[in-house]
Amino acid sequence: MYAIIETGGKQVKVEEGQTVYIEKLAAEAGETVTFENVLFVGGDTVKVGNPSVAGATVTAKVEKQGRGKKITVFKYKPKKNNHKKQGHRQPYTKVVIEKINA
């Protein structure tokens, strides 16, 4: 059984027992979070939401909070002696999907 959930402005396909990296959540490591915006549930029977499946939830356990690899942003304007170098590390939350309730 799998589900498609929406979190952090993104849609993520999840299965029970799967580890997923998602946009940062306000939860500490070891806490349980519930995703209620379930768009699709697949398996023996298929349920498609309009826009979300009524009564369906996905339960996950927060494994850790972290920050992704550093990327470098470099803006440059030719002939103007104008450049800007900036780094960015995107925060994420690592969760383990425990149960899909549909």
From Swiss-Prot:
Q: Does the keyword RNA-binding apply?
A: yes
Q: What's in the keyword line of the UniProt record? A: Ribonucleoprotein, Ribosomal protein, RNA-binding, rRNA-binding
A GO BP term, please?
Answer: translation
Q: What is the superkingdom listed in this entry's lineage? A: Bacteria
A single Gene Ontology CC annotation of this entry is: ribosome
According to the UniProt entry, its GO molecular function terms are: rRNA binding; structural constituent of ribosome
Protein family: Belongs to the bacterial ribosomal protein bL21 family.
- Quaternary assembly: Part of the 50S ribosomal subunit. Contacts protein L20.
Q: What is this protein called?
A: Large ribosomal subunit protein bL21
Q: Whose protein is this, by species? A: Bacillus pumilus (strain SAFR-032)
